[in-house]
């Protein structure tokens, strides 16, 4: 009789070139074309939250006696493969490359424009 061993998902951290604070453009999905700032990243799941993109509506019940119920709209996670870094100066989305300057420091740069990201 064969023993079945389930595949275990590794909790390895995925290298993401997009970081918190970057300006990105959504390249696929229902919010395609939208531009926003990255608010939070989840490197273990390769996901991120972008300001004003992938909004979800939730109906919240009142918690105390005098309070009324409300509708809350907040951003949900996006997969990192659905976004690209965006240059606000040149109005173009681009991939990110890692370059090493003369001092040996690694910097992120947009491939299309050559703009260095902070």
UniProtKB/Swiss-Prot annotation:
Q: Which UniProt keywords apply?
A: Organellar chromatophore, Plastid, Ribonucleoprotein, Ribosomal protein, RNA-binding, rRNA-binding
A GO-annotated cellular component:
plastid
Compartments reported by the entry: Plastid, Organellar chromatophore
The family database entries (Pfam families) matched by this protein are listed as:
KOW (PF00467), ribosomal_L24 (PF17136)
- Cross-referenced CDD domains: KOW_RPL26
Q: Which GO terms fall under biological process for this protein?
A: translation
Read off the InterPro entries from this record. KOW (IPR005824), Rib_uL2_dom2 (IPR014722), Ribosomal_uL24 (IPR003256), Ribosomal_uL24_CS (IPR005825), Ribosomal_uL24_KOW (IPR041988), Translation_prot_SH3-like_sf (IPR008991)
Tell me the GO molecular function terms. Answer: rRNA binding; structural constituent of ribosome
Which PROSITE patterns does the record match to this protein?
RIBOSOMAL_L24
Keyword Plastid (UniProt): yes
**Self-association state and partner proteins as the record states:** Part of the 50S ribosomal subunit.
Family membership, please give it: Belongs to the universal ribosomal protein uL24 family.
Q: What does the protein in this record do?
A: One of two assembly initiator proteins, it binds directly to the 5'-end of the 23S rRNA, where it nucleates assembly of the 50S subunit.
| PANTHER family registered for this protein in UniProt | MITOCHONDRIAL RIBOSOMAL PROTEIN L24
Please report the name of this protein according to its UniProt entry: Large ribosomal subunit protein uL24c
| Biological source species | Paulinella chromatophora
Which gene is this protein's source? Answer: rpl24
């Amino acid at each position: 009789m064969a023993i079945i061993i389930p595949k275990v998902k590794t909790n390895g951290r995925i290298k993401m070139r997009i970081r918190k604070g970057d300006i990105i453009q959504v390249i696929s999905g229902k919010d395609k074309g939208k531009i926003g700032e990255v608010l939070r990243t989840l490197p273990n799941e390769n996901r991120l939250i972008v300001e004003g993109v992938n909004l979800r509506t939730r109906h919240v019940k009142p918690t105390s006696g005098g309070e009324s119920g409300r509708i809350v709209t907040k951003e949900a996670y996006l997969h990192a493969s659905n976004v690209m870094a965006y240059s606000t100066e040149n109005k173009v989305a681009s991939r990110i490359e890692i370059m090493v300057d003369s001092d040996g420091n690694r910097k992120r740069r947009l491939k299309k424009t050559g703009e260095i990201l902070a």
